[in-house]
């Protein structure tokens, strides 16, 4: 093994020695494309070069951001060398090198900064070596034996201006521009092996391996650089007149040295370094002219007393620098993810349709919102970030990853050193937006601010190609540039043209916390936030991936045949069902799972195969519109038929009401003409009829009041039931006739009794006694007759005969005897008149069909007035006649008068109220449970339930509302109860009901409410279900239960089946 001395100089391959000498004379340090770095190593006991002075270190290229301490990535393990620097520098460097395991010797290396980008492909960087800049252009010869330089001549860089090392460079142009003393000639194809004492580094592998070495801690003697150096000072270091350049920096930064073992890429490397040298030459001219003499003197004094020959023949010559060669252009389109060979190809690509389409698609995806403009189904797509394509499923994504296109892009990115995203599927998220795509640059160069942060903000779409795969130096450089507050100076970058991509991504590996300053801590935090933000989509991707992997099984394996060539190799696959061919083996299973193949399989092989139906949006809209029109048409016909039926029913009701009213009015005015003036002290009775409306009051509708047409099936059932329970015309005529005759007869009885009383008064001798009032003041209709609540089959009506005094048995007998005589006067028909002392009433029965009965109850307001009297006279002190009638019966008759008056005032004009009360009266007659419900309490409840609603209630809604009120427990013991509004003292109208009756009625109401909810109101009403007017609508009512049998109607079958359950209804 040949030991390698760490003090290594770089040289050119002597292809054109004359031009190289001339370039060296003109202070131009270029990089030849064919140069190779020569390395030698000395033994562990190599001579340490210790001189009292050190020479100035120069940056050959533009300084990127900061100087970086790189601890000899290719350094030997036991080499102890101090490279021509003062003692403190050597000590610090030795301490730095000793911090690494496996490097026990105090090996130092001049600091090199490699600002690297993850965006481009990495050609292997030159090994990190130290470099001495001497007064002469001869290579450094050590006194130690076994020092080999491969017989190559090494040109050392002459001393140049101190300030030249501090030229700023934009952060975007982060290439292999080194920031510390750097090798003048970088290798294109390095040696295959580097032999060292303790460790061996080989390049036999073709795969690129990136090893991040933890940077050492900075020492005070470490030469560091800032982007914006304010000044360059010369300071004496030792006793000798030695000039040491001091490079100021606002923040010391460190990055990770990168060790590569892999193939080199000569064309790209040469282009990068040539462009860098061009930039350096343009920026260093003036500074070199000003400080050339002083630097040369310092370099000469640094090597006095040594065995090396110094030839300063070129030190004081300041020839005009040679113009740099034109740097080549490197074109890469980040939108299409391809590289172009030259400017013409790149221009043609930018003008091509493929690039324009991809650029337009990228802009459209950025402008797309996450809601309305999103493409249907994008939320279920897996996206490959590397190729910028979306796959509809997990199988398609897996096939894409294995495909040739993806592998080609991976290979290109690997070559360019660009970051390769993970192959894990990325679920398309509408909230993730990319950076704006910049327009392709057509100029030869682009300018940006020297500050890294400002340059990134100015042109976020520009990406520079680097040969690195690690972005730790990139993030570090940006952090250092953000902390700098020096002069902002714009510079011109080499002619490297790019098209912008989505965003700049950086991921640092491990950064030593001790090397991080306060200003440099912002970038790692930003990178951490980026990583955290990237975790969430991946977790969502894992969740959505399971949803995308459907249970569809591939079918039709036998119909996909392999097509082979003459050699028997499978060249493609052919599907006989779909008549298609494909040459990708990964697409075979996908094709077998595809919807197109499954449809063909279902059509040609297995019709029973289930294939999901995905109609187009247009077909779906057409189908929905067709269904909507059909429903509208059916609804129109249904409403029209209901309106027609309702109109016919209302016409019949109106005709009946008209003729009934005409007859009642005729009878009323006939009676009025017969009654003398003042015959009725309380006014004439109202016209005979169901409602008992007086002429002075507004006419109240009798019978079914005209309502708005029903809107529901419940309304139809209620109105149908109401029509069924409403009295027939014959019954109404019979009631009207007997009531009218009774009223007329009672009027005649009153007149007869008054005449008799007058004759008796005249015969008496006592003239001082005032004449008494009529014994009978009037007759009034009460109960269902006055309220208009008569039902079909009702034969009993009630009248109240008001007396001037308390009714007595004598008065009752007198009226009973006189009434038949007066009836015979009015009509020839015979009526049976009887007296009921228990009821304090006279009962009148007709003898012809339909037989009707009228109950005439005697009462007097005096009985109630006595109860309300609160003077000195108490009820006990008032002397009643000995044969006075039942007091409670008389009070009940007075209460019936008040109830009739209240009903006419409050309930008669309330929509649906009379109809619902008739319905409930029928319910109370049919169902024994409801028979205990007091009629007056029922009327109060219905009126309160309907009047408390927000608006008019249809019959069906009103009935449901009443059942809801009862179901809520309003009549239960302990509830609010129903107070009588016609009584001054609080009185519960439900007081006559016991607890069991209350609970039974509440339970029955709840059961009825359930029947209403299930559209079985006909069971509550005790009627048969209505037949449909049109058979087209049977589908609407039969959707809950199918027919039990073909021969029996469904409603009839249900009636038979549920008859036992609904006997109560």
From Swiss-Prot:
It comes from the Eukaryota. SUPFAM superfamilies: beta-beta-alpha zinc fingers. Transmembrane segments: none annotated. SMART domains: DZF (SM00572), ZnF_C2H2 (SM00355), ZnF_U1 (SM00451). Residues 364-375, 519-532 have a biased composition (Polar residues). InterPro entries: DZF_dom, DZF_dom_C, DZF_dom_N, Matrin/U1-like-C_Znf_C2H2, NT_sf, Znf_C2H2_sf, Znf_C2H2_type. Residues 114-133, 351-375, 416-461, 467-486, 499-533, 667-714, 752-773, 1032-1065 are annotated as: Disordered. Residues 694-1064 form the DZF domain. GO terms for molecular function: DNA binding; RNA binding; zinc ion binding. GO terms for cellular component: cytoplasm; nucleus. It is found in: Nucleus; Cytoplasm. This is Zinc finger RNA-binding protein. Residues 667-676, 755-773, 1053-1065 have a biased composition (Basic and acidic residues). Residues 427-461 have a biased composition (Low complexity). Involved in postimplantation and gastrulation stages of development. Binds to DNA and RNA. Keywords: Cytoplasm, Developmental protein, DNA-binding, Nucleus, Repeat, RNA-binding. Pfam families: DZF_C, DZF_N, zf-met. PANTHER family: ZINC FINGER RNA-BINDING PROTEIN (PTHR45762:SF21).
């Amino acid at each position: 093994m040949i030991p390698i001395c760490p003090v290594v100089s770089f040289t050119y391959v002597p292809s054109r020695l004359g031009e190289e000498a001339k370039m060296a004379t003109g202070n131009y340090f270029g990089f030849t494309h064919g140069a190779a770095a020569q390395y030698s190593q000395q033994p562990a006991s190599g001579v340490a070069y210790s001189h009292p002075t050190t020479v100035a270190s120069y940056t050959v290229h533009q300084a990127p951001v900061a100087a970086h301490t790189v601890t000899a990535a290719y350094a030997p393990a036991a080499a102890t060398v101090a490279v021509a620097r003062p003692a403190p520098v050597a000590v610090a460097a030795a301490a730095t090198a000793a911090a690494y395991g496996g490097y026990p010797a105090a090996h130092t290396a001049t600091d090199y900064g490699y600002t690297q980008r993850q965006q481009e492909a990495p050609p292997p960087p030159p090994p990190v070596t130290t470099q001495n800049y001497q007064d002469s252009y001869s290579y450094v010869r050590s006194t130690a034996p076994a020092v080999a330089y491969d017989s190559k001549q090494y040109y050392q860089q002459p001393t140049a201006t101190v300030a030249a090392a501090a030229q700023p460079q934009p952060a975007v142009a982060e290439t292999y521009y080194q920031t510390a003393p750097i090798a003048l000639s970088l290798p294109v194809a390095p040696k295959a092996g580097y032999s060292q004492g303790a460790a061996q580094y080989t390049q036999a592998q073709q795969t690129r391996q990136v090893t991040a070495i933890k940077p050492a801690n900075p020492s005070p003697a470490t030469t560091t650089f800032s982007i914006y150096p304010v000044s360059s000072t010369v300071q004496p270091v030792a006793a000798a007149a030695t000039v040491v350049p001091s490079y100021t920096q606002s923040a010391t930064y460190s990055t990770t040295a990168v060790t590569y073992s892999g193939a080199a890429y000569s064309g790209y490397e040469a282009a990068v370094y040539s462009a860098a040298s061009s930039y350096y030459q343009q920026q260093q001219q003036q500074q070199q002219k000003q400080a050339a003499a002083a630097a040369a003197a310092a370099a000469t004094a640094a090597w006095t007393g040594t065995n090396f020959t110094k030839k300063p023949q070129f030190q004081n010559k300041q020839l005009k620098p040679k113009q740099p060669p034109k740097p080549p252009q490197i074109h890469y389109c980040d939108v299409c993810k391809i590289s172009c060979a030259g400017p013409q190809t790149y221009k043609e690509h930018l003008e091509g349709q493929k690039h324009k389409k991809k650029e337009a698609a990228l802009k459209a995806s950025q402008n797309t919102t996450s809601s309305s403009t999103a493409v249907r189904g994008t939320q279920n797509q897996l996206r490959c970030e590397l190729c910028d394509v979306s796959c509809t499923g997990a199988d398609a994504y897996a096939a894409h990853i294995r495909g040739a296109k993806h592998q080609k892009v991976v290979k290109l990115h690997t070559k360019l050193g660009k970051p390769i995203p993970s192959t894990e599927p990325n679920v398309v998220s509408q909230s993730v937006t990319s950076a704006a795509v910049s327009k392709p640059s057509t100029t030869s160069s682009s300018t940006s601010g020297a500050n890294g942060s400002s340059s990134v903000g100015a042109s976020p779409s520009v990406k520079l190609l680097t040969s690195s795969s690690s972005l730790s130096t990139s993030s570090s450089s940006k952090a250092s540039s953000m902390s700098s507050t020096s002069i902002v100076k714009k510079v011109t970058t080499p002619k490297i043209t790019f098209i912008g991509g989505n965003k700049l991504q950086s991921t640092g590996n491990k950064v030593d916390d001790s090397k991080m300053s306060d200003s440099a801590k912002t970038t790692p935090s930003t990178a951490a936030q980026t990583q955290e933000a990237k975790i969430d989509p991946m977790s969502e991707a894992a969740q959505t991936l399971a949803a995308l992997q459907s249970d569809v099984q591939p079918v039709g394996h036998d119909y996909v045949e392999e097509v082979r060539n003459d050699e028997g190799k499978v060249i493609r696959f052919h599907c006989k069902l779909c008549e298609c061919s494909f040459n990708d083996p990964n697409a075979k299973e996908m094709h077998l799972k595809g919807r197109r193949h499954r449809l063909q399989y279902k059509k040609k092989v297995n019709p029973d195969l289930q294939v999901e139906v995905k109609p187009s949006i247009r077909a779906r809209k057409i189908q929905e519109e067709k269904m909507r029109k059909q429903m509208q048409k059916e609804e129109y016909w249904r409403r029209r038929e209901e309106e027609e039926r309702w109109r016919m029913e209302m016409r019949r009701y109106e005709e009946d009401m008209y003729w009934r009213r005409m007859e009642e009015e005729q009878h009323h005015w006939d009676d009025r003409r017969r009654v003398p003036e003042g015959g009725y002290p309380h006014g004439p009775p109202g016209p005979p009829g169901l409602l008992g409306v007086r002429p002075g009051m507004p006419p109240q509708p009798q019978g079914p009041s005209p309502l708005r047409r029903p809107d529901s099936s419940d309304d139809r059932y209620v109105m149908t039931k109401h029509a069924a329970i409403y009295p027939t015309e014959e019954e109404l005529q019979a009631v009207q006739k007997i009531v009218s005759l009774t009223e007329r007869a009672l009027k005649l009885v009153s007149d007869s009794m008054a005449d008799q009383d007058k004759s008796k008064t005249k015969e008496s001798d006592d003239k001082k006694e005032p004449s008494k009032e009529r014994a009978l003041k009037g007759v009034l209709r009460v109960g269902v007759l006055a309220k208009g609540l008569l039902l079909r089959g009702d034969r009993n009506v009630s009248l109240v005969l008001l007396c001037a005094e308390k009714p007595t048995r004598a008065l009752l007998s007198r009226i009973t005897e006189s009434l038949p005589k007066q009836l015979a006067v009015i009509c020839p028909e015979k009526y049976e008149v009887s007296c009921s002392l228990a009821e304090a009433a006279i009962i009148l029965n007709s003898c012809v069909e339909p037989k009707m009965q009228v109950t005439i109850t005697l009462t007097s307001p005096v009985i109630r007035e006595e109860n309300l009297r609160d003077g000195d006279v108490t009820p006990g002190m008032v002397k009643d006649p000995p044969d006075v009638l039942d007091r409670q019966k008389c009070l009940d008759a007075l209460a019936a008068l008040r109830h009739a008056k209240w009903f006419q005032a409050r309930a008669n004009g309330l929509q649906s109220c009379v109809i619902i009360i008739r319905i409930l009266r029928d319910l109370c007659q049919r169902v024994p449970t409801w028979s205990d419900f007091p009629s007056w309490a029922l009327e109060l409840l219905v009126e309160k339930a309907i009047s408390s609603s927000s608006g008019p209630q249809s019959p069906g809604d009103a009935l449901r509302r009443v059942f809801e009120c009862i179901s809520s427990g309003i009549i239960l013991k302990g509830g609010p109860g129903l107070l009588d509004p016609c009584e001054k003292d609080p009185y519960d109208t439900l007081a006559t009901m016991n607890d069991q009756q209350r609970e039974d009625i509440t339970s029955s109401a709840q059961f009825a409410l359930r029947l209403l909810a299930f559209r079985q109101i006909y069971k509550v009403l005790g009627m048969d279900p209505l037949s449909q007017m049109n058979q087209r609508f049977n589908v609407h009512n039969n959707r809950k239960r199918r027919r039990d049998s073909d021969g029996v109607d469904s409603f009839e079958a249900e009636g038979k089946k549920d008859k036992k359950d609904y006997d109560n209804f």
